Amino acid sequence: MEAGPSSLLIVLIISVAAGSVFNIQVAAELSRQGAGSTVGGILAIGLAREIAPLLTSCLLAGKVATAYAAQLGTMKVTEQIDAITMLRTDPVEYLVVPRMIAMVVMAPVQCFFFFLAAVWSGQITSTVLYNIPPAVFWGSVRTWLNPGDLPSMLVKALVFGMIIAIVSCGWGLTTKGGPKEVGSSTTGAVVMILVLVAIMDVVLTQVLFGG
C-alpha cells in the first residue's frame, strides 16, 4: 500500500510543481533568446534523464522507506520477527520479498506518472505564461526525446526502488533495543538510501547516457 496509491498523490503534486517551476525558468530564458520552440524538448529530456527518477526516489524514500523501516523495526524490538522464525517461516521471504517486489514494480510506474504530469504542467505554463503554442511544445518534445530516454528513465527508477526496499528493510530487521532505536533505524535508512541513490545516479547516468 505504501508503495502504491498512498504515494501516488504526493508524487503527482510534486511532479506538477517541479514541471511548472523548471519550465518557468527554462521558458523565460529561452523565450528571451528567441528559442521558445525548444522549451518542450529541453524539459522532457531533463525530466526523463534526471529529474523524474531522482525526485521520485527521494519522495519514495521519505514515504515508503520510513514506513518499511519503522514497521520491521517495531516487529524486531517487539520480538515478532523471532516469533515468525520460531514458526519455521523465513522472515526475509515473508516480510522483505513482498516489499521489494512492490517497490520494483511501483517505482517505475510512479516515475512514469511523474514524467507525464510534469511535462503536462510544463506545457500549460509555457502556453499560459509565454504564449508557446501547444503544438510547438509537443513537437519539440517528440523531436528532442530519444527512443531510449524513457526506458532508461524506468531502469533508473527500478534500480532506485530496489535500493529503497533493500536498505529500509535491512535497517528495520537489524534494529536492536527499544522504541527509540526504531526511530534511529528509520532515520539511518533514509540517509543511507539518499546517499546510495545519489552515487548510483552518477553511475547510471554515465552508463545510460554517457555514450
Please state what every model-predicted region is.
Residues 39-82, 110:
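Hydrophobic alpha-helical transmembrane segments of multi-pass membrane transport proteins
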Residues 25-48, 116-158, 162, 166-186, ...:
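Membrane-interfacial helix-loop-helix connectors in multipass membrane proteins
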Residues 2-55, 59:
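Active-site cofactor/substrate anionic-group-binding motifs, chiefly glycine-
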Residues 72-97, 179-182:
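Short cytoplasmic-facing helical segments at TM-TM junctions of multi-pass membrane proteins
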Residues 12-20, 104, 108, 112, ...:
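Generic alpha-helical transmembrane segments of integral inner-membrane proteins
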Residues 182, 188-205:
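Final/C-terminal transmembrane alpha-helix of multipass membrane proteins
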Residues 4-8, 12, 51, 55, ...:
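Selective transmembrane-helix segments that form parts of the transport pathway or gating/packing helices
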